[in-house]
């Protein structure tokens, strides 16, 4: 016999779907099937059962091979690394629970570390823009029930957030949107004809890197002022037409992704997008929201914010929190050789950072805490496997709209495998002993 666990939270992307049903074996140790999830979310649950999964810490040997060690040895190595380091980097935090993040920040305070999350290479520019000009936002529930004008700017949720459109933005029938897709107008701004663009009523194929110009043109068009014949590759007539469509809606939302945050102008793009949203509020109700990637990258910013006052790249090396993107961000620190140890949890910089940064990680004392074998685990001196948050252990996570949701445990982790929080708590305790002895 099997049993079904309902209302399960999906720990994949920032949409944090909360309607999954997971069928588990009678003994509660094996996942049999997953319902309501997208292909990627379902695979996250099934991958926890994968054969050959690493269940014990591995230490890199002088010849490059890995030798299995105990969790006690892993805790000792990690604590000693922090105790000896003058300026360690603690990076990641986006694929773990808020409880684990909180313990990690205690370690950072003791060790005088820099704490940075994956926003540093994706939506960090968004956070800078919000600090500049504020943000008129809302929840995804409001979007589902009220929004009749949807803009996807520089993002492709069909692939990056597969259930976003069916649960919240385009297709669902909401309280005031009882015809679903037919009740809405969808605008996509993207240089490429993506699968999201194919669903749009209007697709602006903007020239690469010229989003700032088009955002400014929309602000001009809202006031019926003059525009050049072509802006960023878009005829002015099309811009005026879209501006009227946006003004005529009852409630609108701009969803934006890394096509805006990591192209030319960076945070200034977001400044302009937020100001466009504020301008639209002179005519109708409009909000704006970042399409956050990892399922708890938003939570990492929240926990850092309420503990230290800044959402990412927090430098605690002087005994108090400092924040200066460009100086205290991970890649800048690694490339300049300013850190002497690296601790990675809930992220994979080995796959996504520039090779110059990855080489530095490989040369330094380093620890990677991850359930998977990843490019980062293969260049780190120590790999510590842990339980999957949202599958084998519960914990608090924040959805992309800053709504906290409790992930739930579905099955038990493999015997003897620690959770992120348990491992960090043991490291924190041992580090306290070492620092006290010093």
Feature annotation, model-predicted:
Residues 190-192, 196-228, 257-258, 265-273, ...:
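Short alpha-helices
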Residues 1-211, 216-221, 233, 258, ...:
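N-terminal export/assembly segments and adjacent metallocofactor-ligating motifs
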